[in-house]
């Protein structure tokens, strides 16, 4: 059995987990230094690309949570190893002080069945599955990478390539391309473009998760997330005119340990007496294909929208009738992006 850092003292702190070193730095070095002068968050950039770890953070009103729309998008060269999850090209969206599109699941304790078989897995993220299979978990080679990060007059674009992460979980050579573009338009709403290319036909699942309420309208191809006050409307648009079959579940495929969700530990780890099962949405392609192209338009609102979101495919672009009464034409390809 490896001795704990406390037992080893200062010996070998460069080779083991460093709580002892952190204690020394904090109490005997850093504590004597003055605190930095506070600065308003609004002085910082609204968007930032952390190139070394493959994370992109986008805000509309940084430092004003009641007005802010915040998206985090990840496609990381560090893979899914150790504490990382199988979440390349996944995103979360919080708005107006509430969680809307979440990374679902819990970590009752490290490597619990729920943590290992749900929370670490791609199926717990706002991502995609190929034939019901996500990215390979716990593998440093299951990587992604940010391929574009661009700021335009009316948009911020981030593109990710998660091909290696999906390829490791499929037969060798089957996965040719899995990419996602995330476009933040007017710092107001999001357009997502998913492109998948396979050697043999396969189905695609498009996933979305929420804390409480999530409903699907098959006629309009629209999912609606409701938080305490705010909402997130998501409409799926297939350029080929295909419809998607949506299902909503309120159960984890691997449940939270009952000692934590219902027992004496629940009060210590949750704000309520029982952990929520959360809501899990999956839109399935109705047929297998070698190539898939899917757009999603996500409109967050501090209340229920007064007008519906209506998006359609026309002449190689998305025509988006916004709930605020405006109409945008969005063109998003590998080579070009425009918002008019």
Describe the role of every protein-language-model region.
Residues 1-100, 151-152, 283, 288-294, ...:
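Carbohydrate-active enzyme catalytic cores, enriched for enzymes
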Residues 8-16, 107-340:
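CBM-like, beta-strand-rich accessory domains located in the C-terminal region of large
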Residues 101-106:
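Catalytic Cys-His active-site segments of thiol-dependent hydrolases/isopeptidases
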């Amino acid at each position: 059995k490896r001795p704990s850092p406390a037992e080893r003292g200062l010996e070998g702190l460069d080779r083991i987990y460093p709580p002892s070193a952190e204690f020394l730095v904090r109490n005997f070095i850093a504590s004597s230094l003055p605190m930095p002068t506070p600065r308003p968050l609004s002085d910082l950039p609204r968007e930032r690309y952390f190139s070394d770890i493959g994370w992109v953070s986008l805000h509309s009103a940084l430092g004003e949570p009641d007005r802010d729309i915040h998206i985090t998008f990840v496609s990381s060269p560090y893979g899914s190893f150790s504490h990382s999850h199988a979440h390349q090209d996944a995103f979360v969206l919080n708005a107006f002080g509430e969680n809307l599109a979440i990374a679902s699941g819990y970590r009752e304790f490290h490597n619990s069945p729920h943590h290992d078989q749900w929370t670490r897995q791609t199926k717990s993220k706002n991502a995609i599955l190929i034939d019901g299979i996500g990215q390979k978990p716990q593998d440093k080679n299951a990587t992604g990478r940010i391929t574009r990060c661009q700021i335009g007059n009316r948009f911020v674009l981030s593109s990710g390539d998660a091909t290696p992460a999906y390829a490791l979980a499929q037969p060798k050579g089957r996965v040719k391309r899995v990419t996602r573009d995330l476009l933040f338009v007017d710092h107001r709403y999001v357009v997502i473009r998913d492109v998948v290319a396979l050697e043999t036909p396969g189905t695609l699942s498009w996933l979305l998760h929420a804390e409480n309420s999530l409903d699907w309208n098959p006629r309009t191809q629209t999912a609606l997330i409701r938080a305490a006050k705010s909402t997130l409307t998501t409409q799926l648009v297939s350029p080929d005119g295909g419809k998607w079959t949506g299902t909503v579940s309120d159960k984890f495929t691997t449940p939270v340990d009952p000692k934590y969700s219902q027992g004496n530990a629940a009060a210590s780890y949750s704000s309520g007496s029982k952990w929520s099962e959360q809501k899990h949405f999956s839109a399935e392609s109705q047929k297998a294909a070698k190539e898939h192209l899917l757009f999603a338009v996500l409109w967050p609102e501090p209340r229920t929208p007064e007008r519906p979101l209506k998006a359609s495919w026309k002449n190689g672009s998305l025509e988006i009738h916004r709930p605020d009464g405006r109409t945008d034409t969005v063109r998003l390809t590998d080579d070009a992006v425009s918002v008019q």
